[in-house]
Amino acid sequence: YLRKVVKAHAEQNELDNLFVFRGHGYNSEAPEAWAGEQIALREQLPALFRTGSTVRFYDFESRWPMKPYLLEKMARKGVDVALCHHHGAPDTQYLNGYRNGSGMNVSIENIKRFLRSKIDGHKDPEKRKAELIAYYGVPEAWCQLSDSLHTADSLLDQAMDVHIEDLYNRPMNPRMVMFDACYNGSFHLDECIAASYIFGPGDCIVTQGNSVNALQDKWPDRYIGLLDCGVRIGQWGRHVHYLETHLIGDPTYRFINRALPG
């Protein structure tokens, strides 16, 4: 890690490649909030939206499951900053919920999967099944459990979200990643998502994460335009962090100042 930090400081790196992602359930999935963030970023980082720079916005509904696409974007060389808005746990980035769809079969399968998740592993499955049938008015057949269904549900859960074991030996290449999520920055634990990004084989050297629950009614990208002015990431963090927010990695890293006259 220290070797790649020293190497990064020797570079003259512009903030000219930005990646932004939104997971399910974030800001109540309001399209107005998602659109408003894009407008705010354009105002703060105008050079990023001109010819020669790259900005990518990905919503959880862009793909299902989103996980392979997110990991592929994070592995791309040249990404300077990645902003990730989603729910989280110390060892998980929650990306997708159940598949959206207007078809009856999609809806029924989602309901069955939900019911199985409430019964499977319960200390009294039969009692729990009866409660769910009475509460939701669903057929008993929809609450069926089997080894094959348990395996299929487990594989789907694994495929929908980024788990910490997905990051072992996988390069995460954005220089800086912001995890606007609960618990991803739980540095007090033996492992957490934010630490796995910087200690992997990729180019990531600093992450911002939250050690406990994170607020959603906030402006997480506030003052981020300062990073294009050569301000160090730690100095930016001093002005925007809440009690639960932390930088993990090198707070002294900065991009070159593109706001200088000429």
Where are these regions (language model features)?
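Cysteine-dependent hydrolase recognition
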Residues: 1-262
